[in-house]
UniProtKB/Swiss-Prot annotation:
GO molecular function, one term: ATP binding
Subunit description: Forms a cylinder of 14 subunits composed of two heptameric rings stacked back-to-back. Interacts with the co-chaperonin GroES.
Lineage, uppermost ranks: Bacteria, Pseudomonadati, Pseudomonadota, Gammaproteobacteria, Lysobacterales
Known catalytic reactions: ATP + H2O + a folded polypeptide = ADP + phosphate + an unfolded polypeptide
Record protein name field: Chaperonin GroEL
GO biological process, one term: protein refolding
Binding residue positions for ATP: 30-33, 51, 87-91, 415, 479-481, 495
Record's function text: Together with its co-chaperonin GroES, plays an essential role in assisting protein folding. The GroEL-GroES system forms a nano-cage that allows encapsulation of the non-native substrate proteins and provides a physical environment optimized to promote and accelerate protein folding.
This protein's UniProt keywords: ATP-binding, Chaperone, Cytoplasm, Isomerase, Nucleotide-binding
Leading EC class: isomerase
Gene name of this polypeptide: groEL
Subcellular location: Cytoplasm
Organism field: Xanthomonas campestris pv. campestris (strain B100)
The keyword ATP-binding appears for this protein: yes
Main location: cytoplasm
Length: 546
C-alpha cells in the first residue's frame, strides 16, 4: 500500500478552501446576463467556449491533492444541482463558496464546527420554506418562455422555441435537443405514438409521393410472436375485409408465406394491410406492445394471457384515426384507447421512473410516457460553426431543464432576488447557542452572494445595489442586463423554484461537511527513483579507428 500524506486542522481546511476558491472563481465568472465566457482546452480539436457553470466545473483538476479535494467537493455541488434541477450550477457554486469561506474563518476563530453546521442547516430550512411561499405556479407559455430565456443567457429565441415545443407536446411530452444542419433553430414535432420500425415490404407503399403507407381509420393487430403461417391470420383478415377497413400488423416478425400473402392481398386491393416489426427487445418490447394496446383500445395477442392468434377476433384489435408507416418509422395518430386507462398506464410508468436507478431505463420510460401522453418534439440547434453549435446546444439543454423545473415547482423572481427576500424568514432566527446563531448569520450573508456576483459581473458596486434591493419588497430587484430597478416578473427575469431551492440545499450540505472536516488523507508524492548507473564500454573494441 502506498504511503499517505495526512494534513490536520487548520492546515487541511486552508488548503481545501484554496481549492474551493480556484474552482468557484472560474465558475462564477459566468453568472448573470453580463457573465463572461470561459475557454476550455480540449485534448484534440478546437477549444470549447462556454458560459455553462457545470461544464467549467467538470474540467477543473488541481495539481495539489488537498486543494483538488476541495475543488472536487464543490464540483459535486454543481453536478448534484444539475442532476436534480438541470440548472443553477453557478448559483450553487457561489453559495457553497460563500458558506465554506465564512465557515472556515469561524472555525479558525475557535467556534464549534458542529454548532456552525446546525445553524446553517436551520437557516437553510427556514429559507426553503420561504422560497416555497414566494413561489408562483407557471401556467402560461409566456412564463415558460421567460424562464427558458433567462436560463439560456437571455437568448429569447431559445426561450420561445422551448415554450412552443411544450405547448405542442404537452408538459409530459418528450423534448429532445439535437445538432441541426442550418443556421437557425428548428422545431420538429411528432404527434401521436412513433416508433422506429418501418414497413417489412416496399409493396405496402400506397403514397408514392412520400414513399409511405398511409392507413385511414385502421384496425391494429398486436402480436408478440413471429407470424409465418397465413392460416393463423385468416380469421382476423376475414373480419377486417368484411368491415372494409385497412389493417396494421405489429408483430415480432412477419415472414415467409404470411408476408407473401399479405403483399398479394394488398396489391390486388382485397385488404389494405401493412406489416411492421414490434419495437424494442425482450421485456421492453412486451411493455411497448402493451402501451400500444392501451393507446388503441386493443389487446396484445399473447400466449402468456391465453390468447392464440388463430382464435383472435376483430374485437381484440385496436383502432386509430390514422397510421403512417415510412421506411424507418411508424406513427399511430389519435388511438381509440380509453383516456382513463391511458392515464392509469402513464401513472404506472411514472412509478417505475421513480423506482429505477438506471439513467438509461429512466430515459426510455420517459419516452414511453411521452408517446402515451402527447408526443415528441425535437429542437434542432442551428449555428454557423462547430464551436458555437456545442455552446448553444448546452444552453438549450440548460434552458429545457429549467423550464421543466419551473413547470414542476413554480417560479420565483430571478437575479438573486428570491434568496434576498427569503432572508426575512432567516433574519429572526436564533440558535441554541452563540455558535449556532453565528452559523445562521453565515447563511444570511451567503444568500446575498448570488446577487452580489451578478452585480459585480455587470461592473457595478454590489453593496450599493444590494441595499437598494433590500429596501424594496416582493419582486422588486435589479436587472443587470440594462441597469434598471423594478419588478423582476415584469422584466421577465424568473428562476424556477426547484433550481434555487436545490442550489441552496446542496451548497449547505457540502459546506457543512467541509466545515466539519478535521483531517485530510492523500497519496504521498512518489520520490523519483535514482537513475541507473552508466554501463561500461564493450570489451574487445580497442584499436578500432573511428
Amino acid at each position: 500500500m502506498a504511503a499517505k500524506d495526512i494534513r490536520f486542522g487548520e492546515d487541511a481546511r486552508t488548503r481545501m478552501v484554496r481549492g474551493v476558491n480556484v474552482l468557484a472563481n472560474a465558475v462564477k465568472a459566468t453568472l448573470g446576463p453580463k457573465g463572461r465566457n470561459v475557454v476550455l482546452e480540449k485534448s484534440f480539436g478546437a477549444p470549447t467556449i462556454t458560459k455553462d457553470g457545470v461544464s467549467v466545473a467538470k474540467e477543473i483538476e488541481l495539481a495539489d491533492k488537498f486543494e483538488n479535494m476541495g475543488a472536487q467537493m464543490v464540483k459535486e455541488v454543481a453536478s448534484r444541482t444539475n442532476d436534480n434541477a438541470g440548472d443553477g450550477t453557478t448559483t450553487a457554486t457561489v453559495l457553497a463558496q460563500a458558506l465554506i469561506r465564512e465557515g472556515a474563518k469561524a472555525v479558525a476563530a475557535g467556534m464549534n464546527p458542529m454548532d456552525l453546521k446546525r445553524g446553517i442547516d436551520q437557516a437553510v430550512k427556514a429559507a426553503v420554506i420561504e422560497l416555497k411561499n414566494i413561489s408562483k405556479p407557471t401556467t402560461d407559455d409566456k412564463a415558460i418562455a421567460q424562464v427558458g430565456t433567462i436560463s439560456a443567457n437571455s437568448d429569447e429565441s431559445i426561450g420561445n422555441i422551448i415554450a412552443e415545443a411544450m405547448q405542442k407536446v404537452g408538459k409530459e411530452g418528450v423534448i429532445t435537443v439535437e445538432e441541426g444542419s442550418g443556421l437557425e433553430n428548428e422545431l420538429d414535432v411528432v404527434e401521436g405514438m412513433q416508433f422506429d420500425r418501418g414497413y417489412l415490404s416496399p409493396y405496402f407503399i400506397n403514397n408514392q409521393q412520400s414513399q409511405s403507407a398511409d392507413l385511414d381509420d385502421p384496425f391494429i393487430l398486436l402480436h408478440d410472436k413471429k407470424i409465418s403461417n397465413v392460416r393463423d391470420l385468416l380469421p382476423v383478415l376475414e373480419g377486417v375485409a368484411k368491415a372494409g377497413k385497412p389493417l396494421l400488423i405489429v408483430a415480432e416478425e412477419v415472414e415467409g408465406e404470411a408476408l407473401a400473402t399479405l403483399v398479394v392481398n394488398t396489391i390486388r386491393g382485397i385488404v389494405k394491410v401493412v406489416a411492421v416489426k414490434a419495437p424494442g427487445f425482450g421485456d421492453r418490447r412486451k411493455a411497448m406492445l402493451e402501451d400500444m394496446a392501451v393507446l388503441t383500445g386493443g389487446t396484445v395477442i399473447s400466449e402468456e394471457v391465453g390468447l392464440a392468434l388463430e382464435k383472435a377476433t376483430i374485437k381484440d384489435l385496436g383502432r386509430a384515426k390514422k397510421v403512417q408507416v415510412s421506411k424507418e418509422n411508424t406513427t399511430i395518430i389519435d388511438g381509440a384507447g380509453d383516456s382513463a386507462t391511458i392515464e392509469a398506464r402513464v401513472g404506472q410508468i411514472k412509478t417505475q421512473i421513480e423506482d429505477t436507478s438506471s439513467d438509461y431505463d429512466r430515459e426510455k420510460l420517459q419516452e414511453r410516457v411521452a408517446k402515451l401522453a402527447g408526443g415528441v418534439a425535437v429542437i434542432k440547434v442551428g449555428a454557423s460553426t462547430e464551436i458555437e453549435m456545442k455552446e448553444k446546444k448546452a444552453r438549450v439543454e440548460d434552458a429545457l431543464h429549467a423550464t421543466r423545473a419551473a413547470v414542476e415547482e413554480g417560479v420565483v423572481p430571478g437575479g438573486g432576488v428570491a434568496l434576498v427576500r427569503a432572508l426575512v424568514a432567516v433574519g429572526n432566527l436564533t440558535g441554541a447557542n452563540e455558535d449556532q446563531t453565528h452559523g445562521i448569520q453565515i447563511a444570511l450573508r451567503a444568500m446575498e452572494a448570488p446577487l452580489r456576483e451578478i452585480v459585480a459581473n455587470a461592473g457595478e458596486e454590489p453593496s450599493v445595489i444590494l441595499n437598494k434591493v433590500k429596501e424594496g419588497t416582493g419582486n422588486y430587484g435589479y436587472n443587470a442586463a440594462n441597469g434598471e430597478f423594478g419588478d423582476m416578473v415584469e422584466f421577465g427575469i424568473l428562476d424556477p423554484t426547484k433550481v434555487t431551492r436545490s442550489a441552496l440545499q446542496n451548497a449547505a450540505s457540502i459546506a457543512g461537511l467541509m466545515i466539519t472536516t478535521e483531517a485530510m488523507v492523500a497519496d504521498a508524492p512518489k520520490k523519483d527513483e535514482p537513475a541507473m548507473p552508466a554501463g561500461g564500454g564493450m570489451g574487445g573494441m580497442g584499436g578500432m579507428d573511428f
